[in-house]
């Protein structure tokens, strides 16, 4: 069972359309689906809403702490509502997947993602679900061979190219049904469906 879906990103209009905010995009989509309005919740350090999705109540959260401090928001809401780490899905951008790809997994390392590192540190475990939304990598972008750390930072803080955005939007749509399966406790089917989707 999933009780909390967290979208990672950075607050503010200047970051809204950037690759790093892919997690926010999916949570916004889920809020619309569930007829919920994300509101500022100071005690949870972000925008939060309780939505009716897949015939159950699910909390949605967009931390307003900036990406690298996302753990504070996640742990604040999870502790308040007694939500266990394995009842949490964190939705985030993933450079190691091509734009338009999506993968679901439970546990594992942060893979260099500072938002995940902070969440793991605050929860005291890596045993939570991650929905990885592919945004591509600067080394695969035009003229991107040999991309260094600075290129990576610039890449995630820029909007995707039009064809990438279309692929990412299609992936967001494909994630909805598998998330519903996961929320109802059918993790195996959720992963099988998402990982074979085209």
Curated annotation (Swiss-Prot):
Record's keyword terms, sorted: Cytoplasm, Hydrolase, RNA-binding, tRNA-binding
Annotated signal peptide: none
Catalytic activity: an N-acyl-L-alpha-aminoacyl-tRNA + H2O = an N-acyl-L-amino acid + a tRNA + H(+)
Annotated positions for site Discriminates between blocked and unblocked aminoacyl-tRNA: 10
Subcellular location: Cytoplasm
Transmembrane domains' residue ranges: none
GO molecular function, one term: tRNA binding
Listed Pfam families: Pept_tRNA_hydro (PF01195)
Enzyme active site: 20
Origin superkingdom: Bacteria
Protein residues bound to tRNA: 15, 66, 68, 114
Site residues (Stabilizes the basic form of H active site to accept a proton), renumbered to this chain: 93
GO BP field: protein quality control for misfolded or incompletely synthesized proteins; rescue of stalled ribosome
GO cellular component terms listed in the entry, alphabetical order: cytoplasm
EC number: 3.1.1.29
SUPFAM superfamilies: Peptidyl-tRNA hydrolase-like (SSF53178)
UniProt xrefs under NCBIfam families: pth
Family named by the database record: Belongs to the PTH family.
Record function comment: Hydrolyzes ribosome-free peptidyl-tRNAs (with 1 or more amino acids incorporated), which drop off the ribosome during protein synthesis, or as a result of ribosome stalling.
Assembly and oligomerization: Monomer.
Protein name per UniProt: Peptidyl-tRNA hydrolase
Organism expressing this protein natively: Cupriavidus taiwanensis (strain DSM 17343 / BCRC 17206 / CCUG 44338 / CIP 107171 / LMG 19424 / R1)
């Amino acid at each position: 069972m999933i009780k909390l879906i967290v979208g990672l990103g950075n607050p503010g209009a200047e970051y809204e359309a950037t690759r790093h905010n892919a997690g926010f995009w999916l949570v916004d989509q889920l809020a619309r689906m569930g007829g919920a309005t994300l509101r500022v919740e100071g005690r949870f350090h972000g925008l939060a809403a309780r939505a009716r999705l897949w015939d159950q109540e699910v909390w949605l959260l967009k931390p307003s702490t900036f990406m690298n401090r996302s753990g504070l928001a996640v742990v604040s809401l999870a502790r308040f509502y007694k939500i266990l780490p394995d009842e949490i899905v964190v939705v985030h951008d993933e450079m190691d997947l091509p734009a338009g790809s999506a993968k679901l997994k439970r546990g594992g390392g942060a893979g260099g993602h500072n938002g995940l590192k902070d969440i793991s540190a605050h929860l005291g475990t890596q045993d939570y679900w991650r929905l990885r939304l592919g945004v591509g990598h600067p080394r695969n972008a035009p003229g991107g061979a040999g991309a260094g750390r600075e290129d990576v930072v610039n890449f995630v803080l820029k909007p995707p190219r039009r064809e990438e955005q279309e692929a990412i939007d299609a992936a967001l749509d494909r994630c909805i049904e598998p998330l519903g399966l996961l929320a109802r406790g059918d993790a195996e089917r959720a992963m099988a469906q998402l990982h074979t989707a085209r």
